C-alpha cells in the first residue's frame, strides 16, 4: 500500500502570509495523481487541486500545487481569513486512494 505522509500537522499563520504543506508518498511513484482538499466544520470537503497542480473551478489563484512522483506541495499565498481550515492530500493512483493525516491551519494569536 501507498502511505501518504503529510506535514506539518499544525500551522499557525496570519492573514497576508504564505504557507506551504508537504505530502510525500512512500514506496512508489504516484505520478501526478494527487489532490488537495479543504475541510471546514459542517461543510463537505472541497476539492481544491487535482493532478498535483490543476486548480478546480472556484479555487482562488492564491492556491497552487506542485510536485510529482513522490513529493508534493500545496502553497497558499496572501492568506485570507476564509483560508483557515484543515487541508488534506489524497493520492488516487489506482487501486489505492489514500489520504494524508491532515494539516490544521489556524489563525496566529
From Swiss-Prot:
Region (Framework-3): 58-89
Chain intervals for the UniProt region annotation (Complementarity-determining-1): 24-35
Region (Framework-2): 36-50
GO biological process: adaptive immune response; immune response
PROSITE patterns: IG_LIKE
Keywords: Adaptive immunity, Bence-Jones protein, Immunity, Immunoglobulin
Region described as Complementarity-determining-2: 51-57
Origin: domain of life: Eukaryota
Sequence segments annotated as region (Framework-4): 99-108
GO CC, alphabetical: immunoglobulin complex
Residues of the signal peptide: none
Region (Complementarity-determining-3): 90-98
Region Framework-1: start-end pairs: 1-23
InterPro entries recorded: Ig-like_dom, Ig-like_dom_sf, Ig-like_fold, Ig_sub, Ig_V-set, IgV_Light_Chain
Other facts noted in the record for this chain: This is a Bence-Jones protein.
Protein name from the UniProt record: Ig kappa chain V region S211
Organism: Rattus norvegicus (Rat)
